[in-house]
Amino acid sequence: MILNSRNNLFNFKFPRKFIPIEVADKYRKYLNRMPGNLITEPIDFINYSIQGIAIPGIQFDPVEQAPNDGTITYHRGSIPIQNTIERQFQVELQLLDGYINYWILQDTLLYYYSKSNRKPFTDDLKLQILDAEGIHVMSAVFEKPILNSIAELELNMSSNIAEFNTFTLNFYYNKFNLKLEID
């Protein structure tokens, strides 16, 4: 029997150096103060809160031609494939107590766009897809990514219930490599 795919069979973590040292140092003391917290490094806290990743599909716009018979025919365009794919993806994260992971990532975004930062890209990001037995089926590497935006944070005084909420980070990447890992 062939099983249906499960949406949670993936592994995506930000690399250890994704949170700059300046930002990590700023939040480490707070994380160590949290009662019952086993996570002391900001990058581990961020990776813990990852809920999902959204990758746009691939779409090619056809070229329309209208021959003399009044019909329209469609053909493949001549634009190189790499220029037709929307090279961006989103990472969804759970909002944690005090919105601390939101503030860490906001500071990270501001760091990457500050004039003092000479590094044009973040480290490559890797997504691993697993099968039902936890075996790696394929890996996707987003090369030379840039953190582009962080979604808005909505606060509301009329709701005082702790509930599951998420926010998203948007990335653009320059190259996408797929590696099949089936032996």
What residue spans do the PLM features occupy?
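Glycine-rich, low-complexity intrinsically disordered segments
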Residues: 1-183
